[in-house]
Amino acid sequence: MVNIIQDFIPVGANNRPGYAMTPLYITVHNTANTAVGADAAAHARYLKNPDTTTSWHFTVDDTEIYQHLPLNENGWHAGDGNGSGNRASIGIEICENADGDFAKATANAQWLIKTLMAEHNISLANVVPHKYWSGKECPRKLLDTWDSFKAGIGGGGSQTYVVKQGDTLTSIARAFGVTVAQLQEWNNIEDPNLIRVGQVLIVSAPSAAEKPELYPLPDGIIQLTTPYTSGEHVFQVQRALAALYFYPDKGAVNNGIDGVYGPKTADAVARFQSVNGLTADGIYGPATKEKIAAQLS
C-alpha cells in the first residue's frame, strides 16, 4: 500500500470546475517534467497556483501519492473539452523527476489504478492513455509498452517482470520458460537487444481480456447533418482518425477533436477514404470503419 495524501485544490479555483462526476474511465498521464524535485508534492503545489488552468485527481511518484480532487468531481486533464475524458475519467499523472525512481512510480500508479478499478467498478478496458482522448503523445514514457503497463495492473492473468541491470531478453526468457520470440511478440519488441532497465515486460501469454480495443469505433453511418451530429460516437471516430494522423483540424485546440461531426471532421474522413481506396464522400460507415480498424490493428 502506498500513502495517499489528500491535498485538494481549493473550492472555487479556476482549475476546480466542481462538475459532478461518476467515473467511468481512468486516464493515465506522464508529467513530462524531469526537473529534480518535480515529485508529487511539487505538482500539488503547482495545482494550487491561481494561474494554473489544468487539474487532475492524483499525482504519483516513487514514494507517495497526492490526491488533488474528490473522485465525484471532474478535472481538466484529458484535452477533450466536455467529452468523457474530462467529464467521466479519473486523471492520474505519473512523475518522471530526475531524482526519482520512475519504475517504482509506475508500479505505484498500477497499484492505485487497480484499487480505483475495484472501488468504482471500472474495467481494465477503460484504463486509457491521455492519447486516447486528444491524440497527444502522452503518457510519453508508457505508450510504447502500453500493453505491458496494463498487464502490470493485475487486472488480467499475465505475469510481468521489471527488467534489471544485466538482464537480456534471452536470460529473461530462460528464467520464465518461454522463448525470446514470444517475449518479442507479447511486448512489441522488434530488436531483442534493445530492452532497458525498469521496462515492464509481459512474461506469460496475455489473455484476450488484457488486450482491449484501444480505439473503439461506432457502428452505423455518420455524415454531415443540420444541425451537426455530436456525441461520444463522434469522439471515437475523431480519436481513431487522429491516431492515424488524419486530424479534423491540426493545430487547433485538441487538433479539432471536439465530438462534433462538422465539415472538418467530414474532410478528415474523406482524406482517409481517398488514400485507402474508398469513395471520398466524407461519410463514416461500415466500409470506412473496417478500413480504420484494419489500420489501427
From Swiss-Prot:
Protein name: N-acetylmuramoyl-L-alanine amidase XlyA
Gene, per the UniProt record: xlyA
GO biological process, one term: cell wall organization
Family indicated by similarity: Belongs to the N-acetylmuramoyl-L-alanine amidase 2 family.
Species in which this protein is naturally found: Bacillus subtilis (strain 168)
Presence of the UniProt keyword Chaperone in the record: no
Keywords: Cell wall biogenesis/degradation, Competence, Hydrolase, Secreted, Signal, Sporulation
SMART domains, alphabetized: Ami_2, LysM
Gene Ontology terms for molecular function: N-acetylmuramoyl-L-alanine amidase activity
Catalysed reaction, written as an equation: Hydrolyzes the link between N-acetylmuramoyl residues and L-amino acid residues in certain cell-wall glycopeptides
Annotated PANTHER family: N-ACETYLMURAMOYL-L-ALANINE AMIDASE AMID, N-ACETYLMURAMOYL-L-ALANINE AMIDASE XLYA
